[in-house]
């Protein structure tokens, strides 16, 4: 996709997402390889970098199956999705939100179609507190209703643009483990890892936006996957916190420290300026 096409359809993330990278895009793009073949993003989240690059050939993945279902429904059923979101917008209230949220507690969600589930999540992310996606140990959504005067629940133009892009390019959409998502990566491809971050302190639990969580062992496994891709000639980039553990794990590679502004935490004290790292296996 050339620049004119990208500007015409105005791609951007369809939702806020914890750890979203929109503000870090200049840093990331500066450190990216100049040329690459396929693009892989195993922790796609809101897709800030993916939509900015708008690659013609890509594999996107996330272990959050509800999130990935949103991508699939925007691709396959955009008009029905828009219709359902329009209904949610018409009915929107705190009571309506809490009732819809409780559908993963009383079994109603199991009777929903895939597009209905996508509309549910996309609606809740537009009106809940700070745009958070958070579930408890039973995989039940537990974010309270937000205080927005006039939230934009239906973005028809954006959904149609994303659908057009996903259908007109070779984009493989997966939901599962990051290792499976990069199995096909070859020499000259580019992989960007944006995993749940290693906590900066003992009081911060390992981030979990799926009920399965992402453990220390997963972080080590990710580092080993990074090394394996490096040995295959793949360009690899990874974002993480500027924690001693992260710097120790990636000490054999190039570590770039950048200042970021965290804007999507549950507590106001967790938002603000913070140092992060971008790791690359190639020179810049």
Swiss-Prot record:
Entry keyword Nucleus: no
- Which EC number(s) are documented for this chain? 2.1.1.72
The first-level EC class reads: transferase
List the molecular function annotations (GO) for this entry: S-adenosyl-L-methionine binding; sequence-specific DNA binding; site-specific DNA-methyltransferase (adenine-specific) activity
Q: Which reaction does it catalyse?
A: a 2'-deoxyadenosine in DNA + S-adenosyl-L-methionine = an N(6)-methyl-2'-deoxyadenosine in DNA + S-adenosyl-L-homocysteine + H(+)
GO biological process entries: DNA restriction-modification system; methylation; mismatch repair
Keywords of the record, alphabetical order, are:
DNA-binding, Methyltransferase, Plasmid, Restriction system, S-adenosyl-L-methionine, Transferase
Fetch the Pfam families from UniProt.
Answer: MethyltransfD12
**Where does the chain bind S-adenosyl-L-methionine?**
17, 21, 62, 194
Please indicate which superkingdom the organism of origin belongs to. Bacteria
Q: Does the keyword Glycoprotein apply?
A: no
* Further remark: The LlaDCHI restriction system has two different methylases. Genes encoded on plasmid pSQR700 confer strong resistance to the three most common lactococcal phage species (936, c2, and P335). Its presence is probably one reason for the strong bacteriophage resistance shown by strain DCH-4 over the years.
Q: Which PANTHER family does the protein's record reference?
A: DNA ADENINE METHYLASE (PTHR30481:SF3)
- Say which family it is in: Belongs to the N(4)/N(6)-methyltransferase family.
Name-wise, this protein is Type II methyltransferase M1.LlaDCHI
Q: What is the lineage of its organism?
A: Bacteria, Bacillati, Bacillota, Bacilli, Lactobacillales
